[in-house]
Regions:
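Conserved class I S-adenosyl-L-methionine
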Residues: 160-170
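Conserved SAM-binding motif I beta-strand of class I
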Residues: 186-191
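A short acidic, Gly/Pro-enriched loop at the edge of an enzyme's catalytic core
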Residues: 220-231
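Conserved Class I S-adenosyl-L-methionine-dependent methyltransferase catalytic core
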Residues: 2, 8-29, 34-40, 49, ...
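Residues lining the SAM
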Residues: 234
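Conserved SAM-binding loop of SAM-dependent methyltransferases across substrates and taxa
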Residues: 171-182
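Conserved SAM-binding loop
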Residues: 199-200
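Conserved SAM-binding strand-loop segment of SAM-dependent methyltransferases
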Residues: 208-219
């Protein structure tokens, strides 16, 4: 009977892969990549700016280098082109929010066996606040949608529409790109009240506060607003 490609080494590699995930999560959570930016910095400088332990900082930096997320020349560390583009907060391609969301989910995933036995969700409160969890989730949705929303806005013809409802719109990424694509369009982002500050931040970033409004509500419990030419459910 074929082993379908699995062997001792590949299974142990799969089992221990979380070591790399946790290393990436730590680098993003500590904003190591953002701190380095376009510079090339020593362990001492990075540890001082992180307010971290020198030995711990050095170990993390070497691990990130082994993963090819940093590059080391002599005694200094710098970002790779990929980490500069994807893991620095000042980059348009930043995906750190989604990575932090994965980090926040990890504490529950290690209790999967418990969830199977008890038949109910498991949510572990760890070293982050509800606000941090919400920000990583919503801004992670923004990170993800930024890769698909422009193409969606181009592919879907809303030229005859004047009012769009973005139902469960989160940070409003799709509403933003539909409005950017259609100058005569105005939109409403409808989502839970706790989503509002994140949506308004994104809408303002794109200069669309005069065309996109946020309406708080729960479409699972309340009537969905009417009077729109089109509705987007993402």
């Amino acid at each position: 009977m074929e082993n379908e490609g699995w062997h001792e080494g590949s299974l142990l590699g799969l089992s221990g892969y979380y070591w790399q995930s946790c290393t990436l999560h730590a680098g993003v959570k500590l904003a190591v990549f953002t701190l380095i930016g376009d510079d090339s910095l020593s362990v001492e400088t990075i540890a001082e700016r992180l307010k971290g332990d020198r030995r711990g900082t050095e170990t993390l930096l070497h691990a990130l280098t082994a993963m090819k997320l940093l590059q080391k020349e002599r005694d200094r560390f710098a970002n790779t082109p990929a980490s500069r583009s994807l893991l620095c907060k000042d980059s348009d391609g930043y995906i750190g929010h989604m990575i932090l969301h994965h980090h926040h989910l990890a504490a529950s995933w290690v209790r999967l066996d418990e969830a199977v036995r008890e038949g109910k969700p498991v949510r572990e409160r760890a070293s982050y606040s509800e606000g941090e969890w919400r920000e990583s989730f919503l801004m992670g949705m923004f990170n993800t949608a930024m890769r698909t929303a422009p193409a969606m806005a181009e592919a879907i013809d809303l030229s005859g529409c004047h009012r769009l409802l973005d139902l469960g719109g989160g940070p409003g990424t799709y509403a933003v790109h539909f409005c950017l694509r259609n100058p005569d369009l105005k939109a409403t982002v409808y989502d839970l009240p706790t989503t509002r500050p994140f949506a308004e931040k994104i809408i303002g970033r794109f200069g669309l506060s005069d065309r996109i409004e946020f309406v708080p509500g729960d479409y699972m419990k309340e009537d969905i607003p009417g009077g729109y030419d089109a509705t987007w459910l993402s």
